[in-house]
Amino acid sequence: MNLSVNRCITGGFVGGFSSCRLNHEKRWVRAGKHCELERERSLVSDAVSLERLESKSIKLAMLASGLGVANLVTLSSAKAADLKMIVLDQATSIYILAEGSLGDSVGNFLYSANQQANEAVQDQLSALSVTSLAVIFGAGLVTSLSPCTLSVLPLTLGYIGAFGSGKSRGQVIGDTVAFALGLATTLALLGIVASFAGKAYGQIGQGLPVAASGLAIVMGLNLLEIIELQLPSFFNNFDPRAAAANFPSSVQAYLAGLTFALAASPCSTPVLATLLGYVATSRDPVIGGSLLLTYTTGYVAPLIVAASFAGALQSLLSLRKVSAWINPISGALLLGGGLYTFLDRLFPAATMVM
């Protein structure tokens, strides 16, 4: 038994469990209050490893999100009912895939809550008011607790934990607010783009949605590791955080939030799809940006709360074990959604029967 083990054993037991554990250097240390430095090192190491592991997933998810928006904003108003059914089908797939880790009762509850939130948003969109904004904000809160969002949560918290290491609670909260503002900005811009794209729908034609569906299928097969897809060198070499390394930490967090919003936007279904569909129909950039900003404020509120509790961040980082499922789940959703929309463009009567 080496010296580090002997010293650790002299500390006895804490809470009925041995106070000894291996640190990242494979040395035995006490797990008491004198090991805060070891915890910080472990937290940063976990965050860095997770970021490297999911780098390709983020970039592919960014492209996938853009394709999803392209499909949404080019839907005609006559297909509003079809859009709702497609969205609900995709949402059902997400929850079925995630229920295994959360339990049937919790999964069913969250799925039901998201359905009710989506219905409440649809009711409010018929006559906008201050109450409508409150309902949309609440829908953002509910959506942030969905199983799909939980699968992306370790990635988000890993980044927050990385830029929060060694800082005071106030600094961590400030950076998290900047990160959340980046998320909100991206989704608000999606609303504005959707409104302008809705105006130009008559000039777009059917070629873009078909091409977008085909690319979604290819990307889904790549995430499932069925085919190999080489990203352009720009995506392989460009790192937005490295490009912003000379900026203050709050600016870096804001720029990172802009990127993470695209990776997390598929998890906002069906509420986000409902809002984007409405904005594309209303064709009002001000309303579009306001609705998406309100929704995103509710969506990111739990992140700000989580950043207020350092212990919560460390415990939530243990959810990184589910990150191995992000690629296959995203690939299955991309493949299924791409096939459905592709067939819908070519054989609309057949997809109506489905």
Swiss-Prot record:
Ranges in the topological domain labelled Lumenal, thylakoid: 1-134, 198-206, 281-285, 343-354
Entry's transmembrane regions: 135-157, 177-197, 207-227, 260-280, 286-306, 322-342
Stromal topological domain residue ranges: 158-176, 228-259, 307-321
GO biological process: cytochrome b6f complex assembly
PANTHER family from the UniProt entry: CYTOCHROME C-TYPE BIOGENESIS CCDA-LIKE CHLOROPLASTIC PROTEIN (PTHR31272:SF6), CYTOCHROME C-TYPE BIOGENESIS PROTEIN HI_1454-RELATED (PTHR31272)
Protein's gene: CCDA
UniProt name for this protein: Cytochrome c-type biogenesis ccda-like chloroplastic protein
Job description of the protein: Required for the transfer of reducing equivalents from stroma to thylakoid lumen. Involved in the biogenesis of the plastid cytochrome b6f complex by probably transferring reducing equivalents from stromal m-type thioredoxin (Trx-m) to the lumenal thioredoxin HCF164.
Family of this protein: Belongs to the DsbD family.
Compartment(s) of residence: Plastid, Chloroplast thylakoid membrane
Alphabetic keyword roster: Chloroplast, Cytochrome c-type biogenesis, Electron transport, Membrane, Plastid, Thylakoid, Transmembrane, Transmembrane helix, Transport
Major site of localization recorded for this protein: plastid
GO cellular component terms, semicolon-separated: chloroplast thylakoid membrane; plastid thylakoid membrane
Lipid bilayer topology: Multi-pass membrane protein
Disruption phenotype annotation: High chlorophyll fluorescence and deficiency in the accumulation of the cytochrome b6f complex subunits. Dwarf due to very slow growth and pale green leaves.
